[in-house]
Amino acid sequence: MKWLRKGLLLFLTLGMFVGIVGCTTQNPQFPVPQTTAQEVTAPTKDPMKEAYKKDPAHFVEFTRSTQPRQHYVPFSELLEYETQYPDCNGTWFRDQLSGEDLIIYNSYLYALENRFIGFNLYVEDSDKDFSYIRELVSLDSPFLEQNYTHYEHIWKRPINYIGKQISVSMEQFTDSRWEMKMEALAKCKQIVQNIPAEYQTQQAKMEYLYDYVCDNVKYVTYESMADESYFYDAVCKGETLCDGYSNMLSLLFRMIGVECCEVMGKGEEGQDGHTWVVAKLGDVYYNFDPTFEDTSEIPSEQRKYFGFSDDLVSMQITDYEEMRPKCTDTSRDFSYADMTVTSLTTWEEVKRIVSISEERLAAGKETTLIGVKAPVDSAQYDVFFDRFSVYAKKSKKISLYTWTMRNTALIEVNLE
């Protein structure tokens, strides 16, 4: 019996072994899952990032606030970059740039339109003025706010110069701020679509849009220049400062096919600068300034700043004087004035001014506006006032107000 038990135990052991082996072999009737080593897939590499690592001097590294944080664009692609909003952005200043300047310009534009909050690049000229190029972008694009004297408050961190590697921070290029711009853009499209049918010519449409801006936007000052959206405020709130007026008007003009750009000027020391629009009326460039329609003290109900020459500009545009469009045609200047003269000091002109002023007074109009198409200094004003007083004997009271521009002047004569 002992040997029988051993044999039975051996038989059972062999049977279990055979069963186990059978279970591990492929059997079409009883398929068994195979246990293999887990395959490990290598993470996909970003080819642009790899190219950047090998040659960072020919790439721009853009940064966003969300993942993936880094985005790499080669110089060659940025040189050819075209705005995603060709009906909204102009190219007047961009078309005059090349090389590094154009790469920097397009880096700002690329970051703005794709909501990147910063970028890094290498430049050959570490002293290059990025702020100057950024201003050119703001003059071509209504989507980039700019204020001449308070610009640093808009940009949260100043531009850092690290050798030849430049780091630019733009914390205002966010999704929420871009949505505000798109809301304003949508409203501008509605304004253009609603131009009445009787405005057929391009000039008539320009006049309608200019009047719309003047009638629906008022000038306000801001307690802080930080984080403000002047374009959005102009279009959607109906209040802004000169930047917002110009952003809105330039965009509306482009939407009807008018070639235009914005222009910035410097005031006297201690005064703020100013922004307005230069646009083509027919084949000629003129200045357009809806801000001054609201803030001007000139007593005229007519539009005073729809199309005028550089002679009527009081601001200095020294930073890019050679780049901006020149407005040399003076035929539209002082279209709102009651008369124009070429001199204030000749007896003949003074007599004519007195005669017209007294005729207007007799008709119940106490104010006469005189456009002087020549430079006028303080000594000439004194001579004019003395001679005017000699001839204006019918008036009990005479008061004169003057506005001096670059090569012209305006005189307001009030008689009683």
Describe each model-derived feature in a short phrase:
Residues 210-214, 250, 382-389:
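Generic solvent-exposed, charged/amphipathic alpha-helical segments
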Residues 1-50, 176, 209, 237-249, ...:
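Gram-positive cell-envelope targeting signals
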Residues 234-235, 306:
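Short clusters of hydrophobic/aromatic residues that line enzyme substrate/ligand-binding pockets
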Residues 19-200, 314-416:
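N-terminal accessory/pre-domain segments preceding catalytic cores
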Residues 178-234:
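Secondary-structure boundary elements
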Residues 219, 289, 403-407:
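Acidic/polar residues at beta-strand termini and the immediately following turn/coil
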Residues 244-311:
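Hydrophobic/aromatic-rich core segments of domains that either
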Residues 175, 215-220, 240-242, 267-271, ...:
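Solvent-exposed loop/turn segments at secondary-structure junctions
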